[in-house]
């Protein structure tokens, strides 16, 4: 990687971290029957893997989560600190760390970023940005809130329609940005 590419990578990674933080300024929508709101930050998490690939997408999200963990109010609703990782939403946040890696890895492995296969990219984003995150989040919610696992899984179905819309928007935006150039570096072998 040349010095110019290193600077570009650092800039893109910092921008992605900032973008995820900005999405947290938009208030969450409380659902009522479970203590986890509908938020937009997960869209930024999905975008990190699709734009920056497995390595730099994970670094970007890891930086965001580290800022949240040390107490900066970067999570939706101005939350931060270790308690926000131990509460009802903790499982989703833990899954977020793995999401850009999984999305980026499979996009790279299947060479979907260089093809016109937007549907294949959508399937990968749905699998790892929606189903994986909601599944891990539901398991955590079950244990943390003492809710039966089946009840927790069923209650998470409320997130699926909105998360699917966010996944579609993510694929459309990411493919458009990738078409502009500069991101192909992150999907080379």
UniProtKB/Swiss-Prot annotation:
Which key words are in the record? Cell membrane, Membrane, Transmembrane, Transmembrane helix, Transport
- The answer to whether the entry has keyword Isomerase is no
* Function field: Probably a biotin-binding protein that interacts with the energy-coupling factor (ECF) ABC-transporter complex. Unlike classic ABC transporters this ECF transporter provides the energy necessary to transport a number of different substrates. The substrates themselves are bound by transmembrane, not extracytoplasmic soluble proteins.
UniProt topology in membrane: Multi-pass membrane protein
Tell me which InterPro entries the record gives.
Answer: BioY
Originating gene: bioY
What highest taxon heads this organism's lineage?
Answer: Bacteria
Assembly description:
In E.coli forms a stable energy-coupling factor (ECF) transporter complex composed of 2 membrane-embedded substrate-binding protein (S component), 2 ATP-binding proteins (A and A' components) and 2 transmembrane proteins (T component), probably with a stoichiometry of 2:1:1:2. May be able to interact with more than 1 S component at a time.
GO CC, alphabetical: plasma membrane
Name the UniProt record assigns to this protein: Biotin transporter BioY
Its lineage opens with: Bacteria, Bacillati, Bacillota, Bacilli, Lactobacillales
Q: Which GO terms describe its molecular function?
A: biotin transmembrane transporter activity
User: Where is the chain membrane-spanning?
Assistant: 19-39, 57-77, 85-105, 123-143, 154-174
């Amino acid at each position: 990687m040349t010095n110019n590419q290193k600077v570009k990578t650092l800039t893109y990674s910092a921008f992605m971290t900032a973008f995820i933080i900005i999405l947290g300024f938009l208030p969450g929508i409380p659902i009522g029957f479970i203590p986890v709101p509908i938020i937009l930050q997960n869209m930024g998490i999905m975008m990190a893997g699709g734009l920056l690939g497995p390595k730099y997408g994970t670094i970007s999200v890891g930086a965001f989560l580290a800022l949240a963990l040390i107490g900066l109010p970067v999570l939706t609703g101005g939350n931060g600190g270790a308690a926000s990782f131990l509460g009802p939403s903790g499982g989703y946040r833990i899954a977020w760390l793995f999401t850009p890696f999984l999305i980026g890895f499979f996009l790279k492995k299947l060479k979907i970023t260089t093809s016109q296969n937007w549907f294949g990219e959508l399937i990968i984003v749905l699998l790892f940005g929606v189903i994986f995150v909601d599944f891990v989040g539901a398991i955590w919610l079950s244990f943390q809130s003492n809710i039966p696992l089946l009840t927790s899984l069923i209650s998470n179905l409320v997130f699926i329609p909105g998360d699917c819309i966010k996944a579609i928007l993510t694929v459309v935006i990411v493919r458009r940005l990738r078409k502009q150039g500069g991101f192909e570096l992150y999907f080379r072998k």
